[in-house]
Amino acid sequence: HFTYTTALISQASLFEAHERYLDLHIVLSGCEQVALAPVESLDEAEVRADEDSTMYRGTPEYSVTLDQNRFLLVFPGEGHLPKLSDSVPMNIDKLVLKIPC
């Protein structure tokens, strides 16, 4: 369970991707943008093997809007950059479930 304030897309930082888990993102309140790109199009920045997480730099191929009516399932090899807003920063209450694959 996470609570945070989104950042503007122009202030975006690192994408994250996993090898052993799917991420199920469920927004409980608020609205956020999640930028997405295949890891093959990104540059590796940092490996966090103990967290099954690799961080990447790069440009999003597309983004999706998450709110209480939409969820996002992110598969291994999909770079994702959550916690974004395209206009005004918003307060978000969200669950992220890690599903072994």
Regions found by a protein language model. Name each.
Residues 1-18, 28-43, 76:
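Conserved short histidine dyad/triad with adjacent acidic residue
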Residues 36-38, 83-86:
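A short secondary-structure junction signal
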Residues 24, 71-73, 89-101:
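A short hydrophobic beta-strand segment most commonly corresponding to one strand
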Residues 65-84:
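Conserved metal-binding segment of the jelly-roll/cupin
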Residues 19-33, 38-40, 47-57, 98-99:
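Short, conserved beta-strand element in jelly-roll/cupin
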Residues 24, 62-64:
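Short, surface-exposed secondary-structure edge patches
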Residues 40-42, 80, 89:
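Short, surface-exposed beta-strand-loop junctions and turns on beta-sheet-rich folds
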